[in-house]
Amino acid sequence: MAYETRLASLASYEKGGVEVIDDDPKNYAFSNIFEVASLAKPFELIAVAKNFEYVLEAVRVEGTSGWRAAAHDQSALVLDGEVEFTFKTLRAGQALPESGSAGVPEDAAETLMGRVVARRGHLTLLPAGRAYRYSSPGPAVLLVQTVEGPETQFRWAEICQTA
């Protein structure tokens, strides 16, 4: 028997689903990251998984985001496309939420620290207390590991299987 590995992308994915034997599918969280990203506006932070305060956010990257920062480390896994991450120091005293990331004003991002160009399968650290932004010439998908924050959107009723 031959097996074929197929990697999903924003342009080509199969939703899949939860197959239950003797239970209610509503008891299980199932969503397809590519489907969530395909329906999202660029740079929305849409939770696709949650464990206590920790979340995985699906982010559609298209164009250049505004500057963001968090008081804690985050990581971003590129699932589709190519994403350039740009990092700058953050203005001293810039307020940040206790959890999650938030947009920061353009002038709060000061000295250029560097950049990372990441493609499918590349994991990029988004360091605590530093400004970052991401950009992509075409649609790309990130999975961001973070803590639930003020801009995290929960759309369980829209994205999870219910029957």
Language model: regions and residue ranges:
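Short, surface-exposed beta-edge/turn micro-motifs
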Residues: 54, 72-75, 140
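Short beta-strand His + acidic residue motifs that chelate non-heme Fe in jelly-roll/DSBH
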Residues: 67-68, 85-86, 114-116, 124-126, ...
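Short, conserved beta-strand element in jelly-roll/cupin
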Residues: 70-91, 99-104
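Short, charged/polar surface micro-motifs in flexible loops or helix N-caps
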Residues: 50-53, 61-64, 81-84, 90-93
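A short hydrophobic beta-strand segment most commonly corresponding to one strand
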Residues: 138-156
